[in-house]
Amino acid sequence: MAVTDRDIFTVTRLNQAVQGLLEGTFPLIWVEGELSSVSRPASGHLYFTLKDSGAQVRCALFRNRAQLMRFRPADGMQVLVRARVGLYAPRGDYQLIVEHMEEAGDGALRRAFEELKQRLEREGLFDAERKRPLPRFPRRLGVITSPTGAAIRDILSVLRRRFPGLPALIYPVPVQGAAAAPAIAEALRTASARKDCDVLILARGGGSLEDLWAFNEEIVARAIHDCEIPVVSGVGHEVDVTIADLAADLRAATPSAAAELVSPLRDEWLLHVERQRRLLVERMQRGLQHQALKLDNLERRLRQQHPERRLQNQAQRVDELERRLALAMQHRLRHRESRLARLQDRLQHRSPARALERLEAREAQLRLRLDSALRRRLDRFEARLAAAGRALHSVSPLATLGRGYSILTTAEGQVIRDASQVQVNDRVEARLGKGRLSCTVVTRYEG
């Protein structure tokens, strides 16, 4: 064969051809194996090797898928992956491009259960303080379960035995599979919104952990927490504990036990009804007695306030007031007559004419005494005034001047008492008994 007739592949072309062959032959497959060489760089992608006792294969799980995992992969874990077979052309290595990874076996479910349980417990969804009491005598029971399963048959059997008259409203849901958890949560929300029943039973028969997994979903736990009606969980057998059991207001070991807890015994109910009947009769009797007593009181008050009775009372009161008015008028009249007599007697003794005569005589006497006193007082004042005038004249400067003396003053009007107050040639003024003189100092003598 000539060289030109050969179909020669480049390395790149070969790897691309193998890549297309692998991807076309193995579109999506499930592979189980043990993790090793787990690596998670800063990019967020996950790289690891999947191996068993005879072989190994490289795997890549990209970041957008890795973020959806419910566990943290580690070396030695047994896992199940859903992947496409591919080839990394630059190195010629074939690998698995993983789209989903889960832990293999019940161990994975158990770890997921514990992680969710711890997270919800930290949020307080399981706190005893939020658990609500069950109604002692419910009017209607709601049951969320499969309409064809053994759980509903067991519940209805218990209800027929304990209390046949208790109506049960069934909310049919699937209790296993991918659609179960959303359907159960929606049934809880519907029952809470409608409020057609007083208590709810969430029930399912026994099964494996995987069979019961719908009752371990977070969406169901939160729907129970948000439900406004008390919820009793009766899922599986006594050894089975689900997240729904922990979130419910009360957990029952089985669906039958849940029905026992929420339904009263017929005899107990009848006893309760009889007790309520007696209480009602007693209350009615007390009420009737109370109303009868009120009626008697009203009749007595009506008799006391009857118009005829009131008119009689008013007539008696009018008579009494008339008698008291007559006595008061007589008493007042006698008092006025007595006072008038006293005033007349006093008037006779105190006649205005006599009083006027006495006043005129006293006035004349007082006039005489006043004139005499005024004359004597005026004479005394005149004598004192004359003496004061004589004394004043004796000390008056004018009198001194009249005896030949004079008063010298400076040109400024200052009285000169000492020769040192003036100088030779100073002008001085001399005041005489009559008139004034203007003088000039010719000579000054000291001492």
Swiss-Prot record:
Which reactions are catalysed by this chain? Exonucleolytic cleavage in either 5'- to 3'- or 3'- to 5'-direction to yield nucleoside 5'-phosphates
Name any one Pfam family assigned in the record.
Answer: Exonuc_VII_L
Q: Which CDD domains match?
A: ExoVII_LU_OBF
GO CC annotations, alphabetized = cytoplasm; exodeoxyribonuclease VII complex
GO MF entries: exodeoxyribonuclease VII activity; nucleic acid binding
Question: What keywords were assigned to this record?
Answer: Cytoplasm, Exonuclease, Hydrolase, Nuclease
This enzyme's EC code(s) = 3.1.11.6
Q: What does this protein do?
A: Bidirectionally degrades single-stranded DNA into large acid-insoluble oligonucleotides, which are then degraded further into small acid-soluble oligonucleotides.
Tell me the NCBIfam families matching this sequence. xseA (TIGR00237)
User: Can you say what this protein is called?
Assistant: Exodeoxyribonuclease 7 large subunit
Task: State the organism of origin.
Answer: Thioalkalivibrio sulfidiphilus (strain HL-EbGR7)
